């Protein structure tokens, strides 16, 4: 091959590469596509397909299985996603980092369907609800094996209070069948503080030391600390789980499918509990922002949100959706929290770095003090 031929070939290749790059960039900016990062199996079976039919926008969804995976991608930047589903606590911690786009609510007409009471509740984490919209709502409460509890405490015993776990005379009797506790220091401490009559979002380290004293007292009776608990509850390996409603409800579903006569129940204790939301947010560097707004607006349609809640067994913040949801969701006070009980619920608010170090240090000491 001659030098001139080689130069001509290089020139053609350079032009071809440049044109391909420009075409790729144009497609990235203008493609009728929406890149989503969400928990696995977190929408109704036809949620995405119906949106695609209505809008002719192709939805490309990647799934994460741990909140750490989502956080790592978002904090690294240039994730490539247009819409993500972080927890409300993560949103509150990261608003000031600039990783989320400030919402243009004029592009979300169905925003009007959101419950103003719940939005005010969430404004504690996202002032004026500027960066995120609630998707699904959950709580942190108690899941338990009905048969095992009756065997231990008698048929008339009612699980309706945090006394069930925090009183040593109760949890000591549960050790034989297994108690699992959520491995989330902020939620467990907030719950313990509230149980002790203290501010669940206290900024005083002495309050956390008091809570740690109670947790250390009951620590010998706790089998393990783990975020995912539903499989052990469903299999009967543990009889009590202090954890997320989502995990316990998954356990209930798994137990029913196994058809082994295992009855699991979930309760939000009368003293109140942590209320949390998974949110919809747009990364600041999203390429298809208008498509993200269209999907947000679609999700806030009452019928769409009702179908999602029916499938997930979660409540939501879309008021008209509750009228359309199945009774198993809308009328279950442990899923759709009634207004009188909502007053007792609390969100976990962000703390400063120094206090977080105290909380994490106390937590590690509690977990390591088995006996």
Predicted feature locations:
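Bacterial N-terminal signal peptides
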Residues: 10-23
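A ligand-binding cleft/hinge motif common to bilobed small-molecule-binding domains
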Residues: 90-93, 240-261
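Conserved C-terminal helix/tail region of periplasmic/extracytoplasmic solute-binding proteins
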Residues: 339-371
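Extracytoplasmic ligand-binding site segments that recognize negatively charged/polar headgroups
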Residues: 91, 95-223, 230, 234
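Periplasmic-binding protein-like
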Residues: 208-216, 260-281
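Early extracytoplasmic/lumenal segment of secretory-pathway proteins
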Residues: 26-97
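Mature extracytoplasmic/periplasmic domains
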Residues: 278, 283-344
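Paired acidic/hydrophobic, glycine-rich loop segments that form the ligand-binding mouth/hinge
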Residues: 81-86, 223, 239-244
């Amino acid at each position: 091959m001659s030098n001139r031929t080689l130069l001509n070939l290089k020139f053609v290749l350079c032009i071809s590469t440049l044109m391909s790059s420009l075409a790729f960039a144009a497609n990235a900016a203008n493609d009728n596509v929406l890149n989503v990062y969400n928990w696995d199996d977190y929408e109704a079976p036809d949620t995405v397909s119906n949106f695609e039919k209505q809008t002719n926008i192709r939805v490309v969804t990647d799934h994460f299985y741990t909140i750490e995976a989502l956080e790592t991608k978002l904090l690294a930047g240039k994730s490539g996603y247009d819409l993500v589903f972080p927890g409300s606590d993560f949103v509150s911690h990261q608003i000031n980092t600039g990783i989320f786009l400030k919402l243009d609510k004029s592009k979300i007409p169905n925003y009007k369907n959101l419950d103003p009471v719940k939005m005010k509740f969430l404004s504690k984490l996202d002032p004026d609800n500027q960066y995120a919209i609630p998707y699904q709502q959950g709580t942190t409460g108690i899941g338990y094996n009905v048969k095992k509890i009756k065997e231990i405490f008698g048929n008339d015993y009612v699980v309706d209070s945090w006394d069930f776990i925090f009183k040593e005379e109760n949890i000591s009797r549960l050790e034989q069948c297994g108690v699992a506790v959520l491995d989330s220091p902020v939620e467990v401490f907030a719950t313990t503080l509230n149980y002790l009559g203290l501010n669940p979002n206290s900024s005083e380290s002495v309050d956390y030391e008091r809570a740690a004293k109670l947790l250390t007292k009951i620590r010998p009776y706790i089998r393990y600390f783990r975020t995912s608990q539903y499989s052990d509850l469903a299999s009967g390996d543990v009889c009590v789980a202090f954890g997320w409603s989502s995990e316990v409800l998954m356990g209930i579903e798994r137990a029913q499918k196994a058809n082994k006569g295992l009855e699991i129940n979930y309760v939000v204790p009368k003293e109140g509990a942590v209320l949390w939301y998974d949110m919809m947010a747009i990364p600041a560097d999203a390429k298809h922002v208008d498509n993200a707004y269209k999907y947000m607006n679609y999700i806030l349609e009452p019928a769409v949100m009702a179908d999602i809640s029916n499938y997930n067994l979660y409540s939501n913040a879309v008021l008209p959706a509750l009228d359309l949801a199945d009774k198993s969701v809308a009328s279950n006070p442990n899923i759709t929290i009634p207004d009188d009980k909502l007053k007792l619920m609390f969100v976990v608010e962000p703390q400063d770095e120094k206090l977080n170090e105290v909380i994490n240090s106390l937590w590690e000491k509690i977990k390591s003090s088995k006996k």
